[in-house]
Design a protein with these regions (language model features):
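N-terminal low-complexity, Pro/Thr-rich disordered segments
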Residues: 14, 28-80, 184-196
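Aromatic sugar-binding surface patches on proteins
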Residues: 133, 143-148, 267-275
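Surface-exposed interaction/gating patches
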Residues: 189-258, 274-289, 293-294, 299
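Beta-sandwich strand segments
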Residues: 110-114, 170-179, 232-236, 298-302
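N-terminal edge beta-strand
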Residues: 70-96, 198-218
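Residue-level recognition of secondary-structure-to-loop junctions
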Residues: 141, 148-155, 280-281, 292
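Beta-strand-rich structural segments
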Residues: 96-109, 163, 219-231
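Sec-dependent bacterial lipoprotein signal peptides
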Residues: 1-28
Length: 308
């Protein structure tokens, strides 16, 4: 797994320059409401959580979420003395399932103190090996440090679960971690091919357009515009202290990246342009999941992005 301080990220982002590779995106999605983003359908679309973003480009230090970014790929269950543990190695298919896990620190003792990151102390993600079934959940923690994430219907196959957090004390205080484990959902698994690239898509009647030239291992801006019936959307609502939440997973190994918004929330009037700080460490195809909210309803768009 990985951890990093906010200062290292800022230095790296400020130093990043260069020409960009070709960008290709596929967008497909379905919307829903709620504070978690489940995606039971296995068609590379997704069923939402809650979200939002706007435009503008403040300094790196002023960007929402820019104080919380991590290095690495999120594919390990341990980093710098912290470990993600769980007794759940299998989960049932076709129905809701509770996944329980614990983060341990010094002396293998459960960690119970976590700092807020985008209004939550823990962000939990689940995705199948073919990058379908995306779910973004904010689990609950018991006094003993055991977290419970309520997952919606899971399709058979191999899944990876990610825990994103920042300890508020101990050796990892102020560092951002993303640890992960795999879990199996028994049954006859059918792989869904990654959709072909495109630059726009229809999501619950909204048109999402993506522009940008991200290059592997370098910091680049990425913009998303939202329109409906040919008109710019300007009523995006806040979600997790932003107007949109954007998560990415690399094809083949499920490497994790969180693309951070670069504008501040000013009320229920976000959009139509959403700006992000994109730093994808590896070349190849990435599956992006953009979450935004309007009228109290969450919409989640699935994006296929090729990074050179």
């Amino acid at each position: 797994m990985f951890a990093s301080s906010r200062f290292a990220v800022r230095r790296r982002a400020l130093a990043a320059v260069g020409t960009a590779a070709a960008l290709a995106l596929t967008l497909a999605a379905c919307g829903s409401s709620g504070d978690s983003s489940p995606m039971p359908d296995m068609d590379h679309g997704t069923k939402p959580s809650a979200s939002s973003s706007q435009s503008a480009s403040p300094s790196m230090g002023d960007m929402p979420g820019m104080d919380h970014m991590s290095d690495g790929n999120g594919l390990s269950d341990t980093q710098d003395g912290y470990r993600l543990t769980s007794k759940d190695t299998t989960l049932p298919s076709g129905r809701q399932a509770a996944y329980r896990f614990t983060v341990t620190g010094t002396g293998d003792k459960p960690v119970t103190g976590f700092a807020l990151d985008q209004t939550k102390r823990m962000h939990f993600y689940a995705i199948r090996s073919d990058l379908t079934g995306f779910q973004h959940i904010h689990p609950t923690m018991a006094p003993d440090g055991t977290w419970t994430a309520d997952l919606t219907s899971l399709a058979p196959g191999s899944w990876r679960t990610f825990a994103s957090f920042t300890p508020d004390s101990g050796t990892g205080k102020g560092k951002d971690f993303v640890l992960s484990r795999t879990v199996t959902v028994p049954g006859n698994a059918t792989k869904t091919p990654l959709p072909a690239p495109a630059t726009t898509a229809e999501v619950d009647g909204y048109t999402v357009t993506v522009k940008g030239e991200p290059m592997a291992g370098m910091a680049h801006p990425l913009s998303v515009s939202v329109s409906k019936d040919g008109k710019p959307v300007t009523d995006l609502q806040p979600y997790l202290d932003t107007y949109a939440h954007l998560t990415a997973f690399h094809e083949g190994d499920q490497e994790f990246a969180h693309l951070h918004p670069t504008t501040k929330v000013t009320g229920d009037n976000g959009g139509p342009d959403l700006a992000f700080h994109a730093e994808l460490p590896t070349a190849g195809s990435w599956r992006l999941f953009l979450q935004f909210r309007t009228g109290g309803k969450l919409h989640t768009a699935a994006l296929t992005l090729h990074v050179g």
